Amino acid sequence: MAADTPWPVFDTHLHVGVSTTCTFVAEEVLIPWMDDGGVDFQAVFQVNQGACHRTPDWNPYIGNDYIAKIQRMFPERVIGLATINPWQQPPGKYSYPPDLRGKPFDRVTRNLAIEECHRAILELGLWGLKMHPKEHGYPVNHRAVRSILTELTKVQAQAKRRLMIVVHAAADSTYNTNEAIMDVCRDFPELLFLMAHSGYIWGGKTLAPTIGPLDNVLFDLTCCAETQTVAEAYERYGVERFVTGSDGPFATIEVKHAIVNGTFKSAEERSLVLGGNILKRLGIPWTRKADGRFALQG
């Protein structure tokens, strides 16, 4: 625990569950992971490979239901983020044959993505979304994503709490360039976006001018190993725009601290990046218990 710091440590990036690439059984290993790494509060979401809406019978360690289960198990320390497939929506209009193009298409009308948006936040109690455009194969500024974000804005108002959207933003495909992320985030100023990896490695040269003017987007230093990638953004927009996570269990918490220590020189700034900034933005109430440990009260 970071009992000697002014702010709790809030790690923004941890994959939990079981898939072909991961065996992080959160029920058993999450709290030891956090305690060993000095993490007070942890944002968790599904492993990218195998992510789905509803937890299936064959694997109880994937799905948004699993993330909600972990959040319920550790409510004082964990917030969960949902994964939603933007392609599970009806087309709305014909694209083919040519003579019907643009006309209403009503053969498929159920919208599973929008349904899951409501279920994940209002029923399961999750705190937002994790989006991986590259891994899951969608342009982050596609109209299918925009429809989810439009609905999420409404759901946020219904839930009466600030939600967060963690976006894989390494600029490692045309689906998640700085420019594409800027294009969609500027249209949803009510939503809080965390730009995971802060454009490292391919987007570092345009990070500050594209994302910097958008106050609803935070630079998330998760596995951003090159200080020069974020140097201009730090100089122009200040420490208040930065947060960080571990990218566990694929990276270690020590990597996170090395990045933060190498970028921010004062203890006050490091404390803001490690937890203060995201807690202020989300507005989640927290307290310090008699034993010195921090606890969420949301």
Model-found features: residue ranges?
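Histidine-centered catalytic micro-motifs
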Residues: V9-S19, V166-A170
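Acidic-and-aromatic substrate-binding clefts and catalytic sites of carbohydrate-active enzymes
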Residues: V18-A26, G50-I62, P86-K93, F105-N111, ...
